[in-house]
Amino acid sequence: MTMVQSLWRKRASAALEEFRITLPQYLLIQLARRRGAIRPSEAAEELASDRPTLTLVARKCVARGWLSRLRVKLDRRSHLLRLTGLGEELLDRIEAARVLGPEALGDPLDVLDSEERAQFLRALDKVHRRARDLF
């Protein structure tokens, strides 16, 4: 699966170049859209990123105006990341261009018939649950 992920990330990164956004930046602002305001530590965990890397990505997103930082009232050292209107507009443009869907990037599972696909997805789900238990 790592090889498939690597190939997908490479194609997705190339598709995002015209929008002047990196894949990690896109994933972070997409997460902020889904979750609303989110702590950087939670974002790092959800995106399987280390905190220093996520911090750099977040700073760039804030500098570009796609995210804003909100101070947490009870803990002034802590902050949340929230999608801005500019970030929302960027996501809308990317989605409208349909550059990240299977029709643009391809679907590696299209070589499987429906039964094979169902078996594969069940097996993948089983491996995913086991990995969660282990890690």
Where are these regions (language model features)?
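Residues within helix-turn-helix
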Residues: 40-41, 52, 59, 79
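Short, charged, intrinsically disordered terminal tails
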Residues: 129-135
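Charged, amphipathic alpha-helical coiled-coil/dimerization segments
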Residues: 59-122
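Short, conserved catalytic or interaction motifs in soluble domains
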Residues: 34, 85, 132
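N-terminal helix-turn-helix DNA-binding core of bacterial DNA-binding proteins
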Residues: 6-50
